[in-house]
Amino acid sequence: MVTEQEIEAIGKTLVDPKQPLQARFRALFTLRGLGGPDAISWISRGFEDSSALLKHELAYCLGQMRDARAIPVLADVLQDTSQEPMVRHEAGEALGAIGNPEVLGLLKQYSTDPVVEVAETCQLAVGRLEWLQQHPGEATCAGPYLSVDPAPPAAEQDVGRLREALLDEARPLFERYRAMFALRNVGGKEAALALAEGLQCGSALFRHEVGYVLGQLQHEAAVPGLAATLARTTESPMVRHECAEALGAIARPACLAALREHIEDPEQVVRESCEVALDMYEYESSQDFQYADGLERLRPPP
């Protein structure tokens, strides 16, 4: 049983800017796993932070918790134009992930936002909520991954056909996202290489999602594409950061070299992502039981 004091101690680590970013991330994922109103309250307090990376991750976790009590804070973040685009985007995506149709009006309103990543995110979230309404009771988390995705995977299993749908920029973004998650679920080298081709597509939002999905897939065939995208200084920081985190999750020696190369990147979100990714690399390469170890750090060993 987790005590109120323990949740408070983990929450204080999360919101303390003096703590190393890695410790704050581990605290965040611990709170996400614990869930409930106190965890939501602590996570919500972090949106004043100076790190866009941390704030975007706060929004991501609130969406993955799928608790309607997080809707008000996420709606505020989406509407707050002083927040960085990647933070607002993640808040919009999180509102779609929670799956409550009451936010449809708000998401439709921001589907024409002047910030293209925010507009596209809200369009996808509207697509997801409308899909849920048309397919009640149908599992959206089917497959080997537990994440709540911005679009349900396509039923198609053929990698060639899915690749074609993924890379066809004339198709609706929602349809291409469905192909993306289907490729991830199929898995294997061919699917990883098809996804990596998506890192060349036109939409920065799309490219960043490809980076995220390749991190979930953890296939080393994607490492060259991810490393090249991370190294491309003209690329959107939102995309580069996702590629860095994917390299941390894949955790092969070639990933380590790419991450170390950008640990002092002039772009804050890229620099911080490499820090967090190196911590993730360490975890993936270790025998540690879990990454979200906020409770273990509080409790003395038996």
From Swiss-Prot:
HEAT-like PBS-type repeats lie at residues 54-80, 87-113, 175-201, 206-232, 239-265. The modification N-acetylmethionine is found at M1. Fe cation 2 binds at H89, E90, H208. Coiled coil: none annotated. Pathway: Protein modification; eIF5A hypusination. It holds the Pfam family HEAT_2. Signal peptide: none annotated. It comes from the Eukaryota. It catalyses: [eIF5A protein]-deoxyhypusine + AH2 + O2 = [eIF5A protein]-hypusine + A + H2O. One of its GO terms (molecular function) is iron ion binding. Keywords: Acetylation, Hypusine biosynthesis, Iron, Metal-binding, Monooxygenase, Oxidoreductase, Repeat. GO terms for biological process: peptidyl-lysine modification to peptidyl-hypusine. Disulfide bonds: none annotated. GO terms for cellular component: cytosol. Its cofactor is Fe(2+). Binds 2 Fe(2+) ions per subunit. The keyword Glycosyltransferase does not apply. It is an enzyme of class 1 (oxidoreductase). InterPro entries: ARM-like, ARM-type_fold, Deoxyhypusine_hydroxylase, PBS_lyase_HEAT. Fe cation 1 binds at H56, H241, E242. Disruption phenotype: Embryonic lethal between E3.5 and E9.5. SMART domains: EZ_HEAT. Its EC number is 1.14.99.29. Catalyzes the hydroxylation of the N(6)-(4-aminobutyl)-L-lysine intermediate produced by deoxyhypusine synthase/DHPS on a critical lysine of the eukaryotic translation initiation factor 5A/eIF-5A. This is the second step of the post-translational modification of that lysine into an unusual amino acid residue named hypusine. Hypusination is unique to mature eIF-5A factor and is essential for its function. Belongs to the deoxyhypusine hydroxylase family. This is Deoxyhypusine hydroxylase. It comes from Mus musculus.
